[in-house]
Amino acid sequence: MAAKEVVFGNDARVKMLAGVNILANAVKVTLGPKGRNVVLDKSFGSPLITKDGVSVAKEIELEDKFENMGAQMVKEVASKANDAAGDGTTTATVLAQAIVTEGLKAVAAGMNPMDLKRGIDKAVIAAVAELKNLSQDCADSKAIAQVGTISANSDESIGQIIATAMEKVGKEGVITVEEGQALENELDVVEGMQFDRGYLSPYFINKPETGSVELDHPFVLLVDKKISNIRELLPILEGLAKTGKPLLIVAEDVEGEALATLVVNNMRGIVKVAAVKAPGFGDRRKAMLQDVAILTGGTVIAEEIGLELEKATLEDLGTAKRVVITKDNTTIIDGNGEQAQIEARVSQIKQQIEESTSDYDKEKLQERMAKLAGGVAVIKVGAATEVEMKEKKARVEDALHATRAAVEEGVVPGGGVALIRVASKIADVEVANEDQKHGVVIALRAMEAPLRQIATNAGEEASVVANNVKNGSGNYGYNAGNDTYGDMLEMGILDPTKVTRSALQFAASIAGLMITTEAMVAELPKADAPDMGGMGGMGGMGGMM
């Protein structure tokens, strides 16, 4: 086992804080409408220009092991916020840096780290409850467009296109983002169906940059049983090899020899294939398989209706224009089923909804109906260059996550105002001692940090802006986009409640743990072995007699 270096107390905390600051300072320049871009070097291709906090955070690795630990913990804050709400990563990073900085000052002054953490936790619990009270429903298309605009760094065209997409496929509909061919953004609404089952083996992936499987004009085989013997699939695979088209297998499960053979055939390029489990369980699975069959114009191969997999032909398979499979979801776009049959199936499900007495069953039936009758909206991002395309696509994806979060939990005034208003209402949280009280104060000060950073990035004096906003009430705040004060909701500056809540919770959780650090352990850097010295020249050989 390699030797380790251990640092204690203040030495450890100073190193950790240095790492936190390096990462947070790189991320926080992107915050707000006047935030700057960060350029990321790539080992291949052109550099990536981004204003997305989590993209910047993920690129940072520091040479010093102890500083790197601090940076990695803040990176975790950004990643968690991104996973939970899809946005708010920069806000979370700024909050974490503020809590760690203030917390470590208090620890250096002799306060108890555990009590400080308890105080911070109490303040955050109260703040989250207060955020829910402050939250308003995000019901209309205008509010959705405003949320999308703010998340896409004040790009109104992105906010508008997302609002239109949600209007067309419904708030629960499936919206995907793709790279377009034009200079402008375009919206395509395609009939399609998505269900929550991903690929059965990562070896099916053919788009490594997105970690997904994409099949163009595939056949779709639907089987209501487990497939473990490859012999059952041979007739279909042989027929398929002649057509040169890909195949999507949707079955109860594909395992053992069958899965291994499919993977090998796929990797060798003999047959382009992907397999996923059928959605749902029991009777619901049978019904959902039938939905997919009607959508794609195929037949469900089930022994209970006298159909055997070995005797199946290409006529039994459904077809679709495109299938996209990720780790968690499968989307079938433009199935070639007959419209009359799809409409009949939708009206049949409507009838079942009316007759059902169970709320759970009704919800599941409505989901099925939306998938059959709704569709998939595809936002095609337009740009002049590949570098701009990547940057714009990341912003559209962020905006989409933010609007979904807004529909889910509502919206609060944006621009850091919500946290300022919440902080003013929770100053008297009940605590057990003075150190816990200081923990609450640390959390309250940190809640000002996002607004201060937005003002700093806009070239304003942060303290002046923060005081002006604190002296106001309700939705009164600072619009950094045009350097004015006013009602944030009227100016269309909204943040999803879920994004603000997640940012605060994850920042406090990880920053609180960092404050309580007393020792750090890391491997010693390996000393490079010296190069071998040059070998002396060989002496000449004596003349031979």
UniProtKB/Swiss-Prot annotation:
List of residues binding ATP: 30-33, 51, 87-91, 415, 495
CDD domains attached to this UniProt entry: GroEL
SUPFAM superfamilies per record: GroEL apical domain-like, GroEL equatorial domain-like, GroEL-intermediate domain like
Domain of life: Bacteria
A biological process term (GO) from this entry: chaperone cofactor-dependent protein refolding
EC number in record: 5.6.1.7
Main location: cytoplasm
CC annotations in GO: GroEL-GroES complex
Entries under InterPro entries matching the protein: Chaperonin_Cpn60_CS, Cpn60/GroEL, Cpn60/GroEL/TCP-1, GroEL-like_apical_dom_sf, GROEL-like_equatorial_sf, TCP-1-like_intermed_sf
Catalyzed reactions: ATP + H2O + a folded polypeptide = ADP + phosphate + an unfolded polypeptide
Alphabetic keyword roster: ATP-binding, Chaperone, Cytoplasm, Isomerase, Nucleotide-binding
Compartmental location: Cytoplasm
Class of enzymatic activity (EC top level): isomerase
One of the record's GO molecular function terms: unfolded protein binding
Family to which this protein belongs: Belongs to the chaperonin (HSP60) family.
Subunit structure, interactors included: Forms a cylinder of 14 subunits composed of two heptameric rings stacked back-to-back. Interacts with the co-chaperonin GroES.
Function recorded in the entry: Together with its co-chaperonin GroES, plays an essential role in assisting protein folding. The GroEL-GroES system forms a nano-cage that allows encapsulation of the non-native substrate proteins and provides a physical environment optimized to promote and accelerate protein folding.
Name under which the protein is recorded: Chaperonin GroEL
Gene: groEL
